Structures are given as C-alpha cells and as structure tokens.
C-alpha cells in the first residue's frame, strides 16, 4: 500500500535551528526536500568521512587479532595514521613495480656491471645494447662496419650488443641505455621488500580497529546527513529559518504535537501536481516478501501509481516454480533457508523478509517439481522413492502434457494481463470522466479474443476452432478502446477525433497485446531448457558412476555436481530475466505503471 503524504513546512528561529533539527531527527518521519547546498562544516564532515572510509578499506578482517568493540582513542587520528601508512605502502609498491620492470628489461642481456662498462668506455671501448627483429639481425651481420654480438633470441626479437672504438648508430635497431645494473636493482628490491614488510606489519596492527571504524563511518553518515539538512535550511530575514519536506498523513498529528512542544511551527498542505513526492510503501504478509526483490532492482512506483507487491508475489510464486521446475532444487533452497535463518537466530539477529522469500519460493519449486515428477531431472529418483510418484499430476506428465503446460502458460498470461485492466477499470470508474473506464472493458474483450486466437494458432486448430464471434469480440473491443480511450471530459466527438491521430499507435498496441500473451510461453521454454541441461549431465555421469575405476567414479561425481550447480545458477538467472520481466514489463505496461518514483527516506537517527 502506498501511504498518503502531506507536504510540510517547518519554521524555527535561526538561533535554534540545530536544536530544532535534532528534534525533527528524533521524530524520524519527515522526508526532507534536499537543495544540495554547501557549508564549511558539511565539507569538513564529508572529508572526515572520506578519511575514515579510506582507512577502513585498507584494513582486513583478521581472525588472529581480537577486534576492539569500543575505544577511547581519537578515531579520526587513527584513521589518518592508517591512510598515511597506506600511502607509504602504495609508494613503495610503485617503486617495487618500477624496479621489477627495470630488472625485466636488463635481465635479457644478462648480469653485467655498469662500472665495468664505464671503465671500458674510458679506454675507448664502447659497449651498447640493442634489440631488433630476428630477420633484420641476419642482415646486420653482413655489414662489415658493425661489430655485434648476439645475447639472446626471444620469439621474433634478437637482443645483442655492439662493441667498438666509438659509439655506433644502428638506425634499424632500438638502443637501450641503463641507469642501473642487476646487482644494484636486486639490492634495492631487497631493501624495498624489507621496508614493505615493516609497513604491512604496522598496518596489520590496526586491524583491531576495523569494527570501530565501520561503526564510526555509519555515525559520520548521519553527521553528513544532518549537516546537509542544516545547510539546506533557508533563512528568512535572518531571524527565521525553515525547511520543507513530506510526512506520511498518518504522522501529521504526531509531528504537529512534537513541533509545538519544541517551540517551532509547522504548516501542512496537500501535495501539488508538480511536486516530487516520495513513495512510502507499507507491505504486510506475502506482499512484504517482495521488498528484497524491489530493493535489488531499485524500482519504486510513482506516488500516484500502484503498489503491485501482493499480485507480484502471487504470480512470481508460479513463475519461479515453472522456471526452476525441479523439486530437488526446491529442497536445496529450503535447506539453505533453514541454515541462513539459524545463523541469524544464533547471532541474536531478527529474521528478514529475505528469509521468508527463500522459503516461499522453495515451496513453489517443490510443488511444481513434485507435480511434474522432476527430481534432479532423473527418473532414477522416482524409482528409488516410489512414493514420489503419488504427487505427480497426470495433466502435466502424461499424453499431451507439453500442450497442456503451454495452455497453462497462456492462461496465466491472460489472467495476469486481464487483472491489470480490471484494476485500471475500477480505478478509472472513480475518476472523471467516468466513461473513460469503458476503454478498459474494450481491452478486456481484446485480450480474451487474442487469447483464443493464440490458442488456435499455436496449440491446436482442431482443439480450439476459430469462430467469427472471436473476431467480433476483438473488433468490438478495439472499437471501445478507440472511442473511449482518449475521453478527457471535453467534447465527446472531438475526443474520438483525437483517437484518429493515434490510430497507428492503437494498431501497434493491439499487436503488442497479442505478443504479450505469447511471451508467457517463456515459462515453459525456460523450464524445459533447465530440465534438458540436468538430464544431459545425468546421462554423461551415469557411465562414469557405473565404472569400477575409482578415478572415473570421482569424475562422474564431479560432472553431476558441476552440471546441477551450473543448472541452478542458470535457472536463478532465468528467474530474474524472465520471471521478473513478466511482472515488471508485460503486466506493468498493461497496468500503465512507469516505476518513476523516488524513495521515501525520512530524516531520522539510525539505531546502532
């Protein structure tokens, strides 16, 4: 349910604005309209939080070090020390990387002393280092004016030195000049490694502060939020400051009483058309299980749109079962849910909607898999446990089962899409002009007619023979949409003329409705693909498992485990791609849902 909101303006004396915001934050229900203004204290808070986050990112969970839960130390100074150490470590790591690169360049020519080369140079013996294409080196050997010595060939490159009484210029080769030799670099690397070890040891001693810094970052998140709201407060004639926002209508009286006690004023009003109103959704029961899904997708309905959580979860239950399609996978999900729940309960943490979602979807997969007799995609399971056969539904497993499942897919599609238009009808019939809602009756007629047409074209023309009445239902439905779809309360016939301007759009929308029904066949197709994958890996592993060779048996176990883990991962991905899509695209399009909302984020103090 989307909660009704009220617009609120809060006015206080400028000298008391900090105290007023503290009271407002303690109340914890007002969504503040942010202006993203700046202030010195806000900048400082953001900079301090950035230092804390940098320090936290440099620390590691260390099982050998007991993490401190509290400390009287200055956390910011500790964080700065960690960041400085981190910068020093990065600096030495860069030096090490540069030295290793230099060593790789020199090592091709072998170990030599630059001092010896300089001494030879003083005696007019010049040694130079070059590299060249292997084919070009052979040509270079034919030049009588060049005295060269091959050091090494690496792939298609020749590394060589030239020796002479003067410096030579070999234009077809690349010359290398070195500042250090291998001995110097190796000694330098040794020193750098020792310093790095010391620095890494020093920073590891700070790992005990990881929990404290994590809590301090959360604390600074609230400080930054408070400073941002403080900066956003607008001043009127220097004596008064005010801020605007939104509050749930159910909290209006409570807020009014709270601000009166605090000594500042509040003015309430209904939101206007152009206001960006936050969407506050209250969910209960099954609908609450949708929260983790919408949080992951980051989709929020607009304030004037509808909360589809309950319907979403009803149909998602069916979609999940048909896409996963394996009862054994459902049992695995159920066991994972139990383990996750126990881990939370043992730590004293409350269970979340996510835990309920796992159990809810597990049951879906178990039910559908049991009805189709699918357990790890293998008939051997049914042979080993004959009782499982009693759960099979003949409509889904015997003759014409494929056609029956496809029929179910299309029926689910027409049910969900029709539900969207029924919902639209009941909403529009309460609004003016009431006749606009008749277009939804037209849509219902179209969808039902198109549904029968889909059954005729895809399933069976003999089982679903086409009658003229079906075409007439579609035509009449399109006519109703055409006549009443653009009615806005002005002249009836002028609104019909507006429909002529969108006649192509109307045609495409009707075709889209046909395609939307067909798209529900993905429930069958994706489920069948998952069954085929599991069956294929089962077939591959059986000869290996029947072998008397232990190595082959182990290989068979690996094959079957890999196959089913892969299939579970692909099936879960399919649930997101296809199961969520049917709710968020096909259903939402027919409902007119644009998911254009912004989240309700009340200004409140977070519990530690």
From Swiss-Prot:
Q: Does the keyword Zinc-finger apply?
A: no
Per the record, what is one GO cellular component? Answer: proton-transporting V-type ATPase, V0 domain
Tell me the protein's name.
Answer: V-type ATP synthase subunit I
Q: Which organism is it from?
A: Borreliella burgdorferi (strain ATCC 35210 / DSM 4680 / CIP 102532 / B31)
Q: Which InterPro entries match?
A: V-ATPase_116kDa_su (IPR002490)
Question: What domain of life does the UniProt record list for this protein's source?
Answer: Bacteria
Provide the family line.
Belongs to the V-ATPase 116 kDa subunit family.
**Subcellular location, record wording:** Cell membrane
Known role? Produces ATP from ADP in the presence of a proton gradient across the membrane.
Q: Which GO terms describe its biological process?
A: vacuolar acidification
Keyword Cell membrane assigned: yes
* UniProt topology in membrane: Multi-pass membrane protein
């Amino acid at each position: 349910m989307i909660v009704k909101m009220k617009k609120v303006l809060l006015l206080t004396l400028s000298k008391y604005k900090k105290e007023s915001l503290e009271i407002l934050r303690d109340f914890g229900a007002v969504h503040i309209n942010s202006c993203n203004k700046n202030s010195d204290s806000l900048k400082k808070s953001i900079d301090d939080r950035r230092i804390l986050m940098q320090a936290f990112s440099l620390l590691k969970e260390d099982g050998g070090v007991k993490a401190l839960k509290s400390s009287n130390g200055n956390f910011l100074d500790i964080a700065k020390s960690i960041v400085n150490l981190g910068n020093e470590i990065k600096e030495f790591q860069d030096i090490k990387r540069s030295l290793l690169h230099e060593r790789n360049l020199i090592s091709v020519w072998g170990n030599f002393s630059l001092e010896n080369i300089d001494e030879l140079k003083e005696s007019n013996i010049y040694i130079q280092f070059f590299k060249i294409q292997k084919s070009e080196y052979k040509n270079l050997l034919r030049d009588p004016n060049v005295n060269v010595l091959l050091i090494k060939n690496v792939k298609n490159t020749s590394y060589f030195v030239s020796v002479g009484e003067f410096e030579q210029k070999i234009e077809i080769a690349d010359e290398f000049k070195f500042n250090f030799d291998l001995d110097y670099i190796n000694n330098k690397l040794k020193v750098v490694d020792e310093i790095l070890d010391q620095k890494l040891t020093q920073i590891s001693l700070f790992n005990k502060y990881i929990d404290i810094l994590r809590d301090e970052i959360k604390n600074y998140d609230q400080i930054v939020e408070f400073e941002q709201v403080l900066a956003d407060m607008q001043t009127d004639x220097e004596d008064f400051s005010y801020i605007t926002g939104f509050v749930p209508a159910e909290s209006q009286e409570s807020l009014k009483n709270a601000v009166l006690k605090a000594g500042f004023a509040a003015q309430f009003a209904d939101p206007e058309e152009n206001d960006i109103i936050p969407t506050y959704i209250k969910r209960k029961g099954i609908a609450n299980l949708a929260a983790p899904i919408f949080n992951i997708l980051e989709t929020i309905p607009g304030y004037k749109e509808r909360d589809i959580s309950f319907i979403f979860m009803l149909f998602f239950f069916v979609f999940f079962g048909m896409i996963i399609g394996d009862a054994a996978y459902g049992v695995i999900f159920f066991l994972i849910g139990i383990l996750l729940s126990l881990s939370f309960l043992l730590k004293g943490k409350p269970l979340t909607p996510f835990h309920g979602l796992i159990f809810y979807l597990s049951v879906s997969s178990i039910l559908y898999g049991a009805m189709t007799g699918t357990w790890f995609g293998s008939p051997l399971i049914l042979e080993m446990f004959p009782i499982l056969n009693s759960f099979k539904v003949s409509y889904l497993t015997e003759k014409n089962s494929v056609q029956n499942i496809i029929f179910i897919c299309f029926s689910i599609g027409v049910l969900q899409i029709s539900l969207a238009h029924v919902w639209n009808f009941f909403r529009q019939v309460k609004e003016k002009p009431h006749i606009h809602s008749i277009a939804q009756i037209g849509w219902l007629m179209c969808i039902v007619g198109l549904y029968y047409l889909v059954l005729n074209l895809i399933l069976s023309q003999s089982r679903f023979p086409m009658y003229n009445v079906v075409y007439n239902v579609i035509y009449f439905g399109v006519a109703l949409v055409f006549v009443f779809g653009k009615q806005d309360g002005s002249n009836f016939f002028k609104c019909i003329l507006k429909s002529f301007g969108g006649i192509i759009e109307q045609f495409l929308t009707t075709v889209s409705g046909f395609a939307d029904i067909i798209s529900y066949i993905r429930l069958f197709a994706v489920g069948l693909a998952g069954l085929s994958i599991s069956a294929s890996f089962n077939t591959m592993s059986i000869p290996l498992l029947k072998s008397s060779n232990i190595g082959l048996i182990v290989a068979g176990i690996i094959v079957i485990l890999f196959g089913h883990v892969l299939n579970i991962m692909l099936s879960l991905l399919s649930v997101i791609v296809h199961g969520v899509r049917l709710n968020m695209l096909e259903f939402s399009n027919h409902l007119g849902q644009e998911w254009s909302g912004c989240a309700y984020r009340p200004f409140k103090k977070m519990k530690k």
